[in-house]
């Protein structure tokens, strides 16, 4: 939103936002060695602190290239934080309840993401206050994990897994994760930018991103529970088909916004179809992850990154 207000071009905005996933890739490749050296808790603390710092720097340097570098650092930080959390949950779950456990985790994640979107309404994105507020919230995440008495997962020495080995171990899981990652990265990165370019108000921008996150949160547990009862691959196929249908509906609802005012429907149709699309698509992350981890459970000699 701030990038649109600063009149960054769409190309510059897309380039800047892609830095998050560049950092995500870098972090995913390096975090196993970090965890093996210093442990889960120290990795979480270090990168939560880095994320909090990087957020503040955004408000100092208003430049697409600088923001690209900052987004890379944010991506590295967040993938390390997520990996610690998810490996901890994986260590405490088994194949019988993993779908439900990961779904509860995703409910919490998406719910807080959705609620956090409304922070845009406390102060204009043109000011520095939103950056400070997000930095404070990020820093607060350190307190529970630094004070916990629970023992972190025991880190097991892992073998690097090539893409070919991953495909042979779980072809469905690998292909699904590639498509899911491509779609969801574009959605979460550019939805707010798209809404701003459509002249949505600040409240409407926060509301549409809230709908995206909260509907995904609501659907996590029931769909995760179904995946524990039925074949996860079948559940993934069904929700993928539903997401495809509702994404097409979103396209047509956007077209209605360009009709003359007397004949156009309101933005409510777009909100409705986006909600249904999110309801079907967002649970796929936990389902795909559970599929990949099931392969690891089924074969002790299958290398798997926590």
Where are these regions (language model features)?
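Conserved small/polar residues in nucleotide/adenosyl-binding loops
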Residues: 294-301
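C-terminal membrane-cytosol helix-exit motif in multi-pass small-molecule transporters
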Residues: 135-154
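Helix-to-loop junctions at the C-terminal end of transmembrane segments
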Residues: 28-39, 220-231
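Paired small-residue
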Residues: 65-73, 268-276
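Cytoplasmic helix-loop-helix junction between adjacent transmembrane helices
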Residues: 74-105
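Helix-breaking motifs and short loop linkers at transmembrane-helix boundaries and internal kinks
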Residues: 61-62, 231, 253-254
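Structural signature of the two symmetry-related core transmembrane helices
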Residues: 43-56, 235-248
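Residue-level signature of mid-helix packing/kink "hotspots" within the transmembrane helices
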Residues: 21-25, 29, 113-114, 213-217, ...
């Amino acid at each position: 939103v701030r990038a649109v207000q600063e009149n960054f071009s769409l190309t510059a905005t897309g380039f800047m936002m892609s830095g998050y996933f560049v950092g995500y890739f870098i972090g995913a490749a390096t975090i196993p060695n970090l965890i093996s050296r210093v442990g889960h808790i120290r990795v979480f603390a270090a990168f939560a602190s880095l994320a909090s710092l990087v957020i503040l720097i955004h408000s100092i340097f208003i430049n697409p290239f600088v923001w690209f570098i900052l987004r890379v650092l944010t991506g590295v930080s967040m993938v390390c934080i997520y990996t610690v959390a998810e490996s901890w949950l994986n260590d405490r779950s088994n194949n019988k309840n993993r779908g439900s456990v990961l779904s509860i985790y995703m409910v919490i994640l998406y719910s807080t993401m959705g609620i956090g979107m409304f922070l845009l309404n406390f102060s204009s994105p043109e000011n520095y206050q939103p950056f400070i507020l997000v930095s404070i919230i990020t820093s607060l995440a350190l307190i529970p994990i630094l004070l916990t008495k629970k023992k972190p997962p025991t880190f097991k020495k892992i073998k690097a897994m090539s893409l070919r080995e991953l495909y042979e171990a779980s072809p469905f899981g690998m292909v699904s994760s590639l498509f899911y990652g491509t779609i969801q990265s574009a959605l979460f990165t550019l939805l707010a930018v798209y809404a701003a370019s459509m002249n949505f108000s600040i409240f409407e921008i926060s509301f549409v991103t809230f709908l995206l996150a909260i509907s995904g949160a609501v659907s996590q547990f029931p769909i995760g529970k179904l995946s524990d009862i039925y074949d996860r691959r079948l559940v993934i196929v069904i929700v993928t088909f539903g997401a495809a249908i509702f994404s097409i509906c979103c396209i047509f609802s956007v077209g209605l916004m360009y009709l003359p005012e007397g004949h156009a429907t309101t933005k409510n149709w777009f909100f409705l179809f986006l909600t249904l699309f999110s309801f079907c698509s967002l649970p796929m992350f936990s389902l795909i992850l559970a599929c990949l981890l099931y392969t690891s459970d089924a074969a002790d000699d299958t290398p798997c990154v926590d």
